[in-house]
Amino acid sequence: MINLIKDSGNRREFKTGAVRDMAEGKGRMDLLPWSAIIEVSKHCENGAKKYGEHNVDKGIPTSSLCDSAARHLAKYLAGHTDEDHLLASAWNLLWALEMRNKHPEMVNTPWVDDIADKE
């Protein structure tokens, strides 16, 4: 086990006099919309029941995830209430980001390649 505390050399001091390493660039977890994240986690739970746990971790092309996200968003905007389309859209977009970050081989946006070829 690595027993190392990373240090940027920058400090922030609290009213109490305590100091910590600056958090800039590390992400602000305190700014996340937790009620929405809980909704997404329940959508993950339901998906695990249908497809098995960690099915999406095997890899889904980003084009499929973005297509589904756009379709769900269009249905949400059109007023469809047969399922939570806004939630489903968010889930698909989050997993597209996850594929980009952890499975770059799943990133397949042919329309981007087509545009780049024309420039």
Residues covered by each model-derived region:
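Intrinsically disordered, low-complexity regulatory regions
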Residues: 1-119
